[in-house]
C-alpha cells in the first residue's frame, strides 16, 4: 500500500504555522469583543436543504461545489460551504430573536467547497465571520464594514480597497432583471455555458461570472443602482454618507453581486493589492430576507466573512513569529539537575514565562546549540552543583552575558526578568 497523504485541497497546519493562525484569531476576537460580538459555534455539517434554500440552487456553490452525502439513514447532509446559513438556522432554532433587540454574533472555523485548489484557496478553508441580526439601520452595515477593516489593518494588511454596491429589495431586483435580460439576450451565444443557463433562471448571477469573455460583455450592463426604489436608494445613500463621515474611502461597483443569492441592499468586498490575483479578503452584505426564508420571523441582518488562508500567506511574508520564541531554554546535566529542571520549568511557566526544557540529556555544548536554534532569549543552566546549592546560571543569548543567581531569586524577580526579556526581544 502506498503512502497515505492529505486529500488534494486540504492542508496540514503544522506547528511552525499555527502561531500565525492563533494570533490572527486572537486579534479578531479582541476587536470584535470591543463591539460586544459574542462567539457562536455551529456544526460542520447540516441538512443539505438548509444551503439549497438559503444560498440558492442556481449558485455555483450549491450547483457545483458542495460536499454532499447520504448518512446511514439516507438523509442528505452537506459539509458547510459557508457560515451564515448555519448561524441563521441556530438563531431560529434556539429562538434567539425572542430576546429582542440586536444580536451580534461571530464565528470561526472550517468551510468546504469543491474548487480548484490554488495558493490561498483550498477545498477545506477557514473563515472568521460576523452576523448582526435584528437591525435594518444603515449604521449596522457601516458597523460591520468598519470592524472588518479594523481587523485587517490590525494584522498588517495595507492598500485596502472597499467596493460597495446595493442589490436593493426583491422588487428592485425584479425590475433590474428585465433590464439585464434586454441587454444580455443579444449576447447569449457569446456567453459561457453556465451564464447561458442562468440567463432565464437568475441573470443577476451572470455578473458574478469568472469567464473572461462574459466579464467583458458585462462591462457595459445597465447599473442596478439606476433601478433602486426610493427606500433602497435612501438606505444606500445613508451607508455612503456614514462611510464618508468616518473617512472611509470606497468605490461604487455596480457589478458587485457576491456569489450567494441571499444578499439584499448593501453588498461589499474588501480587497488588498498585497495579495495579487486573489485580492478579495473579506466579502459580505445585508440579507434581510434569509431568516424568514428559512422559517424564522422576518428579521433584517448583515454580516461578512474573512478568508483566513489568504491572510496567513500575507502574515508569513510580513510578520516574524517572535511570540513563538521561548523566554528561557532550560539545559541540565546530571541526575539531580535533571530532576530539579522539571520542577523549575514548571515554576517558571506558572509565573507566565515560556520555557522550553531540553530533554536530550546530551552534553551542555549540544544543548546550548539547541538553545541557539530555538532563538531563546535566555538560557538557564543547571548542573548537579547548582542543584545542590540552589543556584542557576542565566545566560542572555543576544549578549552572551552570564550571571549566577539563586533559584529563589530567579522565581521572586519575575517582574524584573520580564522587563529584561522585553528589552532583549526589542
Swiss-Prot record:
GO terms for cellular component: cytoplasm. Keywords: Aminoacyl-tRNA synthetase, ATP-binding, Cytoplasm, Ligase, Nucleotide-binding, Protein biosynthesis. It catalyses: tRNA(His) + L-histidine + ATP = L-histidyl-tRNA(His) + AMP + diphosphate + H(+). It is found in: Cytoplasm. Transmembrane segments: none annotated. It is an enzyme of class 6 (ligase). Homodimer. Belongs to the class-II aminoacyl-tRNA synthetase family. NCBIfam families: hisS. This is Histidine--tRNA ligase. It comes from Microcystis aeruginosa (strain NIES-843 / IAM M-2473). The gene is hisS.
Amino acid at each position: 500500500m502506498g503512502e497515505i497523504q492529505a486529500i488534494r485541497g486540504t492542508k496540514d497546519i503544522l506547528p511552525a504555522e499555527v502561531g500565525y493562525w492563533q494570533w490572527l484569531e486572537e486579534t479578531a476576537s479582541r476587536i470584535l469583543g470591543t463591539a460586544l460580538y459574542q462567539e457562536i459555534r455551529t456544526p460542520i455539517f447540516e441538512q443539505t436543504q438548509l444551503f439549497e434554500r438559503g444560498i440558492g440552487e442556481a449558485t455555483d456553490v450549491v450547483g457545483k461545489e458542495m460536499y454532499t452525502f447520504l448518512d446511514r439513514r439516507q438523509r442528505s447532509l452537506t459539509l458547510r460551504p459557508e457560515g451564515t446559513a448555519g448561524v441563521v438556522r441556530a438563531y431560529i432554532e434556539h429562538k434567539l430573536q425572542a430576546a429582542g433587540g440586536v444580536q451580534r454574533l461571530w464565528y470561526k472555523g472550517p468551510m468546504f467547497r469543491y474548487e480548484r485548489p490554488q495558493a490561498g484557496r483550498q477545498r477545506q478553508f477557514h473563515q472568521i465571520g460576523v452576523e448582526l441580526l435584528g437591525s435594518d439601520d444603515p449604521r449596522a452595515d457601516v458597523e460591520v464594514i468598519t470592524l472588518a477593516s479594523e481587523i485587517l489593518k490590525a494584522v498588517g494588511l495595507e492598500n485596502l480597497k472597499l467596493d460597495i454596491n446595493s442589490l436593493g429589495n426583491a422588487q428592485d431586483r425584479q425590475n433590474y432583471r428585465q433590464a439585464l435580460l434586454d441587454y444580455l439576450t443579444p449576447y447569449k451565444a457569446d456567453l459561457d455555458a453556465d451564464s447561458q443557463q442562468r440567463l432565464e433562471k437568475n441573470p443577476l448571477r451572470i455578473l458574478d461570472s469568472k469567464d473572461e469573455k462574459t466579464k467583458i460583455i458585462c462591462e457595459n450592463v445597465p447599473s442596478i443602482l439606476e433601478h433602486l426604489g426610493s427606500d433602497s436608494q435612501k438606505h444606500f445613500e445613508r451607508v455612503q454618507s456614514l462611510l464618508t463621515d468616518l473617512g472611509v474611502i470606497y468605490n461604487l461597483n455596480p457589478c458587485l453581486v457576491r456569489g450567494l443569492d441571499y444578499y439584499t441592499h448593501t453588498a461589499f468586498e474588501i480587497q488588498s493589492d498585497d495579495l495579487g490575483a486573489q485580492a478579495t479578503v473579506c466579502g459580505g452584505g445585508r440579507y434581510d430576507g434569509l431568516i424568514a426564508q428559512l422559517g424564522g420571523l422576518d428579521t433584517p441582518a448583515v454580516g461578512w466573512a474573512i478568508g483566513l488562508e489568504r491572510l496567513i500567506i500575507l502574515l508569513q511574508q510580513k510578520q516574524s513569529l517572535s511570540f513563538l520564541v521561548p523566554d528561557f531554554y532550560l539545559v541540565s546535566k546530571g541526575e539531580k539537575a535533571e530532576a530539579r529542571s522539571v520542577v523549575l520549568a514548571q515554576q517558571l511557566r506558572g509565573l507566565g514565562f515560556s520555557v522550553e526544557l531540553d530533554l536530550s540529556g546530551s552534553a551542555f555544548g549540544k544543548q546550548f546549540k539547541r538553545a541557539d536554534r530555538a532563538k531563546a532569549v535566555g538560557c538557564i543552566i543547571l548542573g548537579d552543583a547548582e542543584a545542590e546549592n540552589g543556584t542557576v546560571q542565566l545566560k542572555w543569548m543576544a549578549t552572551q552575558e552570564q550571571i549566577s543567581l539563586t533559584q529563589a531569586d530567579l522565581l521572586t524577580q519575575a517582574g524584573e526578568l520580564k522587563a529584561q526579556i522585553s528589552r532583549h526581544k526589542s
